Amino acid sequence: MLLKSLEGAAFGAKLKEIAGRKEFHALPESPFIYSIGGGNQLSSDPDYPSLLMAAQKAVEHGYRVFMLPNPHGLKTPDYIFERRGVYKLFDLKNISGKNIVHTRLKESIAQGNRALLNMPQYNTRKLVHDIRKYFVKYPDAIEVLIFKGKNEMSVSRRFALSARFYFEFKRMFEK
């Protein structure tokens, strides 16, 4: 059964089953980050340092992180995050330039319906516009999780499409 065909509790149960597989081993540098083979297979990936850095930020925010292998030629999410028994699938998008969020979110929808944006700084008005546009254009999108420095912000579809999104998000983002 394909993971994409599952919804709700069945989807969460399948993620829990995947995360519970014996092939996942904790990384020596962090007991809350797991990967297939303990990181040996991932460490040759050129994206490994940024994947590991974002995983470490997730651990700081209370998640257990399961780093998923990325087979060549296939678009797959990067992580399973678990916190308080809730399992979620995320695709990492590092944001390093201006006017790039829209493009990175567009790329992520092919890999999953939750995106993780790891960013140092970004124009709030542009970010609000890009996130709202993402949820309007892609009805399957569920959540955008943002790591900005030591802060974590979760944006759901409902929040992004609400009338007060800009004001509430600005208050949280510009702390």
Identify the function of each model-found stretch.
Residues 2-65, 95-175:
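Metal-dependent nuclease catalytic core centered on acidic motifs
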